[in-house]
Amino acid sequence: MVDFKVVLSDPATGKAYNIDASGAGAGSFIGKRIGEEIDGAALGFDGYKIRITGASDRNGTPARKTLQIAGRRKVLMAGGVGFHPRVDGERRRKMVRGAEITQDFVQINAIVATQGSKTLAEYFAPAEPEAPAAE
């Protein structure tokens, strides 16, 4: 099956959380495009809506929202995601991925679109060890 590293950012607090998605949680991303929302319950966050904002594959090739394909393409670019020109007017052919999430992606970037009942900090709080029983 496919595994993704999901970087989930919470705009309310400004914090980002790393999630390892596998199985059904990762399957909910397959076929979605950058900008679409998924249900947070797939990752264990009840009541949350998560918006996909970007992704990259194992080589670090970024996904570009304007490229509506599922594979990789070498595109002539003048700026934006995947290319930062060194001088004004510079254009260069760069390798980018399409906006559709496939099994080839490794990392998916997302933000919280709708908050649930619990905060993300509560989901990611470290479990407190139980106090030893008093004798």
From Swiss-Prot:
Example of a GO biological process term: translation
Keyword check for Nucleotide-binding: no
CC terms in the record's Gene Ontology section: ribonucleoprotein complex; ribosome
Membrane-crossing residue ranges in chain numbering: none
Keyword annotations of the record: Ribonucleoprotein, Ribosomal protein
Gene Ontology molecular-function annotations: structural constituent of ribosome
Record bears the keyword Ribonucleoprotein: yes
Matching InterPro entries: Ribosomal_eS6 (IPR001377), Ribosomal_eS6_arc (IPR020924)
Domain of life (superkingdom): Archaea
One protein family per Pfam: Ribosomal_S6e
Family designation: Belongs to the eukaryotic ribosomal protein eS6 family.
PANTHER family to which the protein is assigned, alphabetical: 40S RIBOSOMAL PROTEIN S6
This protein's name: Small ribosomal subunit protein eS6
Gene name for this UniProt entry: rps6e
